[in-house]
Amino acid sequence: MKFGVIGYKGKMGKLITKTFSNRGHNCVLFVDKDEIEQIDIPEVIVDFSLKDALDKTINLCKKNKSNLVIGTTGFSNEDLEKLQKLSKEVALIQSYNFSLGVNIIVEILNKLNNILKDWDCEIFEIHHSQKKDKPSGTALMFKDALKKEVNINSSRLGGIPGDHTIFFANQGELISISHRTISREVFALGALKAAEWILNKKNGFYTFKDILKEELE
């Protein structure tokens, strides 16, 4: 697979390039801020950079007719509308977290929200001090899965890649569901899985849930 990376000089960009290359894929498009180096036409473009790069990413996908894997966080509704519009021209998969474990928890919460609808619920999340968006995209994914108004408690400390806990409580019991990211490598592996999955998909807007659904069938 020929792929491109937006933000290839960043921590995630370097890790994505390394992970994909180790699988035998070939990076043919390197993008970072005002720098663009293109060797060939990428079949898939991967963007885990900043939301400010979105317009550039969309233009490159259109120009090269490349499918897209995008894990950037902090998008507005307007940004998501831009991606919906792009999905009419290419296949794209968008998620605020490409960890398999996180996406499994989303599915669990989808099934629990009716059973625990009368329980109190709060989400606690911790990320590294350089993370700009608050609350995290992952916490918002969990909140959406719960389908009710939930308070999110956010902290930005040290170099923690990601730590999330959802608490459910009534007068006699406490249930906690937790996920801790030990290494950013899980995001790169998830992006690789998504890129290989979407390579030959028809135009459309996909999420990680579509990958899980296909694997469970």
Swiss-Prot record:
Q: Specify the pathway.
A: Amino-acid biosynthesis; L-lysine biosynthesis via DAP pathway; (S)-tetrahydrodipicolinate from L-aspartate: step 4/4
One GO BP annotation of this record = lysine biosynthetic process via diaminopimelate
Q: Which residues of the sequence carry a binding annotation for NAD(+)?
A: 7-12, 71-73, 95-98
One Pfam family matching this protein: DapB_C
**The enzyme's E.C. designation:** 1.17.1.8
UniProt superkingdom: Bacteria
| Gene Ontology MF: a single term | NAD binding
Chemical reaction(s) catalysed: (S)-2,3,4,5-tetrahydrodipicolinate + NAD(+) + H2O = (2S,4S)-4-hydroxy-2,3,4,5-tetrahydrodipicolinate + NADH + H(+); (S)-2,3,4,5-tetrahydrodipicolinate + NADP(+) + H2O = (2S,4S)-4-hydroxy-2,3,4,5-tetrahydrodipicolinate + NADPH + H(+)
Signal peptide annotation: none
List the record's Gene Ontology CC terms alphabetically. cytosol
Residues recorded as binding (S)-2,3,4,5-tetrahydrodipicolinate, renumbered to this chain, are: 128, 137-138
Known InterPro entries for this protein?
Answer: DapB_C, DapB_N, DapB_N_CS, DHDPR_bac, NAD(P)-bd_dom_sf
Task: Give disulfide pairs as residue numbers.
Answer: none
Q: Where is the active site?
A: 127 (proton donor/acceptor), 131 (proton donor)
Recite the UniProt keywords alphabetically: Amino-acid biosynthesis, Cytoplasm, Diaminopimelate biosynthesis, Lysine biosynthesis, NAD, NADP, Oxidoreductase
Subcellular localization, per the record? Cytoplasm
Chief subcellular location equals cytoplasm
The family line of this record is: Belongs to the DapB family.
Q: Return the NCBIfam families for the record.
A: dapB (TIGR00036)
Q: What does this protein do?
A: Catalyzes the conversion of 4-hydroxy-tetrahydrodipicolinate (HTPA) to tetrahydrodipicolinate.
Which PANTHER family does the entry mention? 4-HYDROXY-TETRAHYDRODIPICOLINATE REDUCTASE 1, CHLOROPLASTIC-RELATED, DIHYDRODIPICOLINATE REDUCTASE
Name under which the protein is recorded: 4-hydroxy-tetrahydrodipicolinate reductase
Per the UniProt entry, what species is this protein from, by scientific name? Thermosipho melanesiensis (strain DSM 12029 / CIP 104789 / BI429)
From the broadest rank down, the organism's phylogenetic lineage runs: Bacteria, Thermotogati, Thermotogota, Thermotogae, Thermotogales
